[in-house]
Design a protein with these regions (language model features):
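Active-site Tyr-X1-5-Lys
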Residues: 1-15, 41-42
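Flexible, glycine-rich beta-alpha linker
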Residues: 12-31, 55
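Hydrophobic alpha-helix immediately C-terminal to the catalytic Tyr-X-X-X-Lys motif of short-chain
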Residues: 2-6, 36, 96
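A generic local structural motif
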Residues: 1, 33-34, 109-111
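C-terminal substrate-binding subdomain of Rossmann-fold SDR/epimerase-dehydratase oxidoreductases
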Residues: 40-161
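Short switch/coupling loops within ABC ATPase nucleotide-binding domains
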Residues: 5, 21-22, 135
Length: 161
């Protein structure tokens, strides 16, 4: 809101993007995808908080970068807000864990732990405005993005002693 207030008050050109569940190589901080990949690489069991039915739409980092570049190039994006995500990459957290397990050739067991916080059950972006005004479309589907992300983590895994 602060950036848009400066736009309204002082004419400072701003644009806001609302990214939905961005993942990919170089990811820092938390996140289910990073946690699942690192857990499998460590040969540990996968841990899912809650029952795994939470629904998420995952957006590969390259698609987010494409959207950022588009808003920088379009003066008509000034003052606007866009949802950026991939509604074609919608899965439950449990299904995500199983996909990653399959793509990594793992047979890791899954452990469910109680959820100790309130979680949003479903996060799916409506990207119609970004499609219409920016001509933006996410290009990387979930399995392709996961494969690239897994490869990145594997390349950085320390060699066995």
């Amino acid at each position: 809101h602060l950036a848009h207030s400066y736009y309204d008050e002082f004419g400072l050109p701003t644009c806001s993007l609302r990214p939905f569940n961005v993942y990919g190589p170089g990811q820092i901080g938390g996140g289910a995808i990073r946690a699942f990949i690192e857990t499998i690489l460590a040969d540990d069991d996968l841990v899912i908080h809650g029952d795994g039915s939470q629904i998420r739409a995952w957006c590969y980092v390259d698609d987010l970068v494409d959207a950022l570049l588009l808003v920088l190039e379009r003066p008509e994006a000034v003052g606007e807000v866009y949802n950026i995500g991939n509604p074609r990459s919608v899965v439950t957290v449990f299904d995500l864990a199983m996909r990653i397990r399959r793509l990594m050739g793992s047979d890791a067991d899954v452990t469910f732990r109680p959820l100790h916080y309130t979680d949003v059950e479903m996060r799916i972006p409506n990207i119609d405005k970004a499609r219409r005004e920016l001509r933006w479309e996410p290009l990387i589907d979930l399995d392709e993005g996961l494969a690239k992300t897994i490869a990145w983590y594997r390349e950085r895994q320390p060699a066995p002693a």
